[in-house]
Every structure is written in C-alpha cells, then in structure tokens.
Amino acid sequence: MSSPHGGLDDQIERLMQCKPLPEPEVRALCEKAKEILMEESNVQPVKSPVTICGDIHGQFHDLAELFRIGGKCPDTNYLFMGDYVDRGYYSVETVTLLVALKVRYPQRITILRGNHESRQITQVYGFYDECLRKYGNANVWKTFTDLFDYFPLTALVESEIFCLHGGLSPSIETLDNIRNFDRVQEVPHEGPMCDLLWSDPDDRCGWGISPRGAGYTFGQDISEQFNHTNNLRLIARAHQLVMEGFNWAHEQKVVTIFSAPNYCYRCGNMASILEVDDCREHTFIQFEPAPRRGEPDVTRRTPDYFL
C-alpha cells in the first residue's frame, strides 16, 4: 500500500540530490506549509532534544553535510534560525528542502524567519535572480517570499533558550510583547519586528546605532535584563559570521551560531550547530565545508556586505 506521504517523500529525495522541484509542485508545497505555519506562534515553543542551526545562505551541499553530521530529520529535531537564501548558489534547493521537511515532519523541524527572508533583500542578494535563472520567471520567488511572511520570528526551547535570527529591540521587554504583534507582513524597515531580525550583541553597554542601517546593537546590560525579566538562561541567535562557527558574548548570556562553512565560498570559517539534549545540556558540533563539485557559472553582481 502506498504511504500517504509518498509524493512528499519522493520530493524530499529529489531535493536531497539538489534537484529543484517543478513550479506547480513548489506552489502546492508552499500552500501546505502556509497552513502549518499560520498555526505557529511568534514565539514558537520547542521541546528538547533539539539541534539549533544558524545561517545557511543557499549553501546546499553544506546543509546536506549538516544533516549528515547532526542526523537526518526526523531522527533529529531541528530549529533553524533563518537566512536560508541569498549569496550561495543553491537557495532554491535549500529553502525548498527545508519547507518540504516542515510539511512532512511539522513537529520535528522549526524554521524561523531571517532578515534575508524578505522581498526587498532577496531582490538584491541573489535569490530573485536564481529563481529567474532556474524557472524562467519570478513565480517561485513570489511564492516563497509570500510564504516567508508566515515564518515564526522566534522560538523558545524548554522555556529557557530564546532563539531568533538577529537580536533584541528597545521596543520589546517581554516575550508577550512579541507574541502580540502581527508578523504576517514584509519585514519593516524599523520597529520591533525589524529589530528581532537585524540587531547584534555588542561589547558596549546599552543600545547603539547599528552599522547595518537596521536594528540596533545591544550590550550585556540589555541581555541580562531581558533574560532576567523573561526567566531565560540563554539567547541563541545567528546573523553574524563567526570564524569558529559559534561565539559566546555577554558572559555566556548570548551565543551566535553560524552554519554556513567557508561562507560565500571564500571566508574560510568553520560552521557549527548546537545540540541541546534531554537534560538541557548543550554541545557545539563544528563542521567544515562539504567537498564541492564544480560551481555553476554565475556572474556575481551583488554588492559585498559582510554582515
């Protein structure tokens, strides 16, 4: 007897071979994903054990390596903190695979929104152009960017590890503040939703102006107050290239996790993932780039901001 998930399992198998799905299949998949994501909270609760991952940026073969090292989904539960697309050569295959896994195993994988899951940013940094190249039109780009509006903004592991792409906001004191806003929209240029996806921890105290032009920098005093107010042990975030794949800040109140090794195929960094076990103990696993088969011939006309 054929399994009710046969078609989806077949799609996942094709995607694991780095083969894009036809446009009608992408559309149907994103419709199913939207129904699942609509039900998720702005602060999505997640149970341990779970493996927390940072930016992927279209580096498909390195995502396959991440699953090889961390365990296949659904054998391992995963929480991804955004930035699936742009910069790497395989944004289409990367984001389609993660969305397909979400539809197939909704309780086993959580996919948060990053600052690159936006219409505006993807038109500059590669995903839009890649969709045009692979499909001959912008329909798949539109389908995915419409879906991105439904991705949860943050997650909370066992009520004590707060996970999000960027960082904190001067407009947000409590997790309830986040639970109460309407996330189904393009990432705004400013305000609390923007800050969650764009802010960075900093060595200086207090709030600072971000060199990125969006979000803020926040000091250890801010992290400590936020963690204290919300009974948190740790803030886990992504958004910044760190050479070892992970980096502690604010006396271990904040950790940055970056999961794209040799970022942009030239930065020479390690990648890492963070395993949180049943006892809420955590272990970082570092990994290097997967062996590369020749890269596609793509002209790079994107500006280099390395943040």
Swiss-Prot record:
Mn(2+) 1 binds at residues 55, 57, 83. It is an enzyme of class 3 (hydrolase). The keyword Ribosomal protein does not apply. Binds 2 manganese ions per subunit. Keywords: Cytoplasm, Hydrolase, Manganese, Metal-binding, Protein phosphatase. CDD domains: MPP_PP2A_PP4_PP6. It is found in: Cytoplasm. One of its GO terms (cellular component) is nucleus. Gene3D superfamilies: 3.60.21.10. The active site is at residue 116. It catalyses: O-phospho-L-seryl-[protein] + H2O = L-seryl-[protein] + phosphate; O-phospho-L-threonyl-[protein] + H2O = L-threonyl-[protein] + phosphate. Its cofactor is Mn(2+). Its EC number is 3.1.3.16. Mn(2+) 2 binds at residues 83, 115, 165, 239. Pfam families: Metallophos. GO terms for biological process: mitotic cell cycle. Belongs to the PPP phosphatase family. PP-2A subfamily. This is Serine/threonine-protein phosphatase PP2A-2 catalytic subunit. It comes from Oryza sativa subsp. japonica. The lineage of its organism: Eukaryota, Viridiplantae, Streptophyta, Embryophyta, Tracheophyta.
